Amino acid sequence: MHIVTSTDILLPRAEDMGAWSVIACDQFTSEPEYWAAAEARAAEKPSTLSLMLPEAWLHTARADGADGRIADTMRRYLAEGVFQTVPDSFIYVERTLSDGRVRRGLVAALDLEQYDF
């Protein structure tokens, strides 16, 4: 096997991408109102918010049992067909920075047993 390879990619079937997507969990750590608004937007809809623990919640009661809830949600999303599978794929990403430069990236599978840095 190669160190970097294609893999089956799971993409959301979500009709409301505003509810599905949230910013990275390490952002807005001192702004709980952002996360409250994200929760309200997601409500009972499938959301990546249900698949992570925002750092803003790390030292709160919300962190208690979060790993189990997240794992349960992952299993439920798989069972309910929340995702569509794009087989044997890579994802190419472009992001334009505030200064106009473009960063490019590739999402791929990485065989950590083969990788040596």
Give residue spans per PLM region.
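A cross-family signal for N-terminal binding/gating loops and helix N-caps
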Residues: 1-116
